Amino acid sequence: KEGSQINWILGERSNGKSYQVKHKKGILRYWCDGVNYHANYKNKNEVIEECIKTKTRRFGLIRRLQEEIKPSVALNYFSDIDVYKITDGKYNTFDIYRERVYLANYDMDTHKTKRGEFIGYLVALSIEQNYAGGSFLDITDLVFEEVITRKIYLKNEPSKLLNLFCTVDRKRGTTRLWLPGNTISRVCPYFEEWGMDTLMRNIKQGDIKSVWIPTGEVDEDGVPVEVKMSVEYCKSTGRSSFVIGKHSE
């Protein structure tokens, strides 16, 4: 909504933050690109088929620890998504193989899963340095669940997250980082290290505030690279009231 590369979405539990982010910035962004860019095709099925052939966008799901990206754990994240409905019956489940997320089909008779479209990556923040030499130019959106936690944060965690973000974006300015979180505490290492203390003290429900933060990198002219960061404090209502933008943006 603000055109920011780093986007906090804060609010009470169970108000739809995570659900909307994983749909709009993960599954739907990948699957429905064809609806926007191939509208000249005759029908929805043709659009989807063409979309499958031409997809280049993927998401990255960030977890704090390595054990959280194991298939048995990570698959729970997608358990509330109706894959069959979204894909018009083409797929009925997800599969994770070598830290990659796939649309897939599970056969009730053979009890086997057949992988289909590769749609996203799983990454562990605790080992962000391991990704430094990799290429993730197909990632358009990064999502870090439970960025605010009652548990223990990693040492230098805000710096690790910025390093990971820079590894993926490669100074292209095209990657978006989504940080849905519950406002269970305003004491958070990110708020201090990213200069958000004043913003968090003054922000009110329904507000969206933006600041610029340094990434620690410099451009080819030696000028420090900054990214725009926005914080949305969702209204407290019985239903989701925040807007994170259309999935096609």
Regions found by a protein language model. Name each.
Residues 1-249:
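Phosphate/NTP-binding elements of NTP-utilizing enzymes
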